[in-house]
C-alpha cells in the first residue's frame, strides 16, 4: 500500500510538472528549463522509493558466527521531522518525503520560509492521493522561530 501511495505522488508530480516548475522558478529565480528538469529528478526520487516500499520484507546478512543469522527488517520509526533549505527546495524535500513515506513514517516538514511554494503544492497533491490525516504535516514560518522549536524538541 505504501508503495502505491508514493507512486501516486510521483504520478501527480509528473502530471503537474509544468505548474511545479513555474512555482520553483518563482521561488528560486532559476531558469524555467532548470526547474522543469528538476521535476523529472523529483519524479524519479519518488518512483525509486515507491519501489523500495514494496521490498521491505527483510534481508539476511552473513555472520561469522556458525548456526546464526542476522536479519535486517525495515520498520517505521515514527515521526520524521524535516527542515529543508532554500536551494533546490522541492528536490531536497523529495529526498526526505519519499523515504519517510515509503518506510511508513509520518512526517512534519518545514520548508525554507523564502522558497515554500513547491513544497506547499506537493503537500496539496499528497492530500489528493489520500494519505491518512496526520501522516503528512506542513509547518510554515521563519527558521529562527519554527525551525528552532522543531530542532529543539
Language-model regions, residue ranges each:
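Glycine-rich loop-to-alpha-helix module at the N-terminal edge of alpha/beta enzyme cores
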Residues: 1-56, 67
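Rossmann-like NAD(P) dinucleotide-binding subdomain of oxidoreductase/dehydrogenase enzymes
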Residues: 48, 58-153
Amino acid at each position: 500500500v505504501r508503495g502505491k501511495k508514493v507512486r501516486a505522488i510521483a504520478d501527480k508530480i509528473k502530471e503537474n510538472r509544468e505548474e511545479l516548475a513555474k512555482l520553483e522558478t518563482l521561488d528560486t529565480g532559476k531558469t524555467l528549463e532548470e526547474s522543469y528538469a528538476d521535476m523529472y529528478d523529483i519524479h524519479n526520487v519518488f518512483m525509486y522509493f515507491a519501489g523500495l516500499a514494496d521490498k521491505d520484507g527483510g534481508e539476511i546478512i552473513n555472520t561469522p558466527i556458525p548456526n546464526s543469522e542476522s536479519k535486517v527488517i525495515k520498520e517505521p520509526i515514527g515521526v520524521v521531522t524535516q527542515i529543508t533549505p532554500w536551494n533546490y527546495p522541492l528536490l531536497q524535500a523529495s529526498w526526505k518525503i519519499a523515504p519517510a513515506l515509503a518506510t511508513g513514517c509520518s512526517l512534519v516538514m518545514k520548508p525554507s520560509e523564502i522558497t515554500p511554494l513547491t513544497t506547499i503544492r506537493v503537500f496539496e497533491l499528497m492530500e489528493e492521493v489520500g494519505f491518512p490525516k496526520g501522516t503528512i504535516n506542513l509547518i510554515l514560518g521563519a527558521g529562527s522561530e519554527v525551525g528552532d522549536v522543531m530542532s529543539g524538541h
